[in-house]
């Protein structure tokens, strides 16, 4: 499965100039790194595992982790949530997620959210402690978020002003939000 996703990712990389990807902080994870990162997780001993990949890109990290979890654990069901906003990469991601679903059909549920991950979680992140609301939490977060500095007036910086000190970096904000979205016994 991962081989097919690597192929579509390589085709995308060849079609999209590096300077354009660099402008939006888009640097894709290599196949070897994705497999290595997936190997680091201790898979929870439960029947239903939730995985979050904020800023999914082409889905290579998700694919490596899902393959690791489901290939050797026949009694596990995975719910994978992917966030991606880049209109150029979305068709590639959708194709890759469709391929993943075709391989692991009844053991994998995929939720693709075409929205800004940080802004979508901002209300939960900033909620008043007296409000009765429960933020969505995941068992595992795997991510290679965009890497770039942003201004303090950027919507993501303003949404997470509690953790913005000095020059904000989108990578840091993604990781801070992912930590917020992690179950207490979860892994990042």
Segments (PLM) and residue ranges:
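SAM-dependent methyltransferase catalytic region
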Residues: 1-188
């Amino acid at each position: 499965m991962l081989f097919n996703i690597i192929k579509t990712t390589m085709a995308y990389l060849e079609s999209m100039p590096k300077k354009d990807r660099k402008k939006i902080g888009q640097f894709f994870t290599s196949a070897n790194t994705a497999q290595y990162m997936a190997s680091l997780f201790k898979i929870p001993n439960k029947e239903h595992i939730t995985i979050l990949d904020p800023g999914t890109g082409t889905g290579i990290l998700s694919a490596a982790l899902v393959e690791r979890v489901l290939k050797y654990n026949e009694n596990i069901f995975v719910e994978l949530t992917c966030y991606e906003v880049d209109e150029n990469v979305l068709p590639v991601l959708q194709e890759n997620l469709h391929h993943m679903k075709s391989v692991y059909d009844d053991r994998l549920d995929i939720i693709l959210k075409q929205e800004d991950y940080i802004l979508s979680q901002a209300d939960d992140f900033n909620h008043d402690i007296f409000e009765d609301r429960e933020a969505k939490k995941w068992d595992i977060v795997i991510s290679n978020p965009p890497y770039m500095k942003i201004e303090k007036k950027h919507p993501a910086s303003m949404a997470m002003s509690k953790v913005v000190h000095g020059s904000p970096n989108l990578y840091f904000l993604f990781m801070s939000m992912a930590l917020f979205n992690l179950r207490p016994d979860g892994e990042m």
